Amino acid sequence: MLECNHNYKEGLTIIFKEVAVENFTKIPTAVLKGANRIELNDNLAVGGTTPSHGVLQEATKYLQEKSVPVVEMIRPRGGDFVYNDLEIKMMESDLFEAQKLGVDGVAFGALTADGDIDEEAMEQLIAASAGMQIVFHMAFDALAEDNKKAAIDWLVDHDVDRILTHGGPLTTPIDDTLDNIKKYIDYADGRIVILPGGGVNFENVDAIAEKLGVKELHGTKIIDGVNN
């Protein structure tokens, strides 16, 4: 007997919904309401930081039992994405912990002060992420615009799986950044998943998916009744 999948739309197009949550509290509701993947954070008020070891351990165990993949945010603080050596070491340590716990994926990004990818830091972090999917998070939106195509190429060359992007500053409504996101999707040309987020919610998710021609989207409020 076929299981009911509430991510089916008319025409049998599936929307794959990644829900960003803060700590464990909302995870059971998100799973119950059809989340396809969870991005686990602490402190969403600053865009998400690394959750505690205890939260990660229990959330990962719960989600493994439910067969829902989890992506852990690896970010030692709010603010910019320019990290010093000590912060990179902290992130490496968190990545090794994630590996031990069987986390499915990790989200991180490191930039230089002049708005480019910090290649040395990223190579260290990627090396510490063996066996897990890698997401370059919204640090992408803080790159200098002229550097974004080269950044996509670099991330493809380093086997990064997805780029999470709002297509511009988070203060700009996503309806006004869709053209930028479409440009990144077209340039990526299937080499890496471009994951739209930041302002995607249960009311606009279908329209955004259709406009961009994507099947995978990210948001805190992407499912009705979770975080809203």
Question: For the regions a protein language model found, what residue spans apply to each?
Answer:
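Active-site-adjacent beta->alpha loops and helix N-cap segments on the catalytic face
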Residues: T25, L44-Q64, T112-A130, L143-A150, ...
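Hydrophobic faces of well-ordered beta-strands that scaffold small-molecule active sites
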Residues: K17-V21, I38-L40, V70-I74, V106-F108, ...
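Glycine/small-residue-rich loop that forms an oxyanion/phosphate-binding "nest" at active or ligand-binding sites
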Residues: S52-T60, E65-I117
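Glycine-rich phosphate-binding active-site loops on the catalytic face of alpha/beta enzymes
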Residues: N36-G48, E97, L101-D114, V160-P173, ...
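N-terminal pre-domain/capping segments
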Residues: I14-N36, N43-T50
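Acidic (Asp/Glu)-rich catalytic clusters
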Residues: V31-L32, L56-P69, F96-K100, E123-S129, ...
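Catalytic cores of alpha/beta
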Residues: E22-L32, V82-L95, D141-H158, Y184, ...
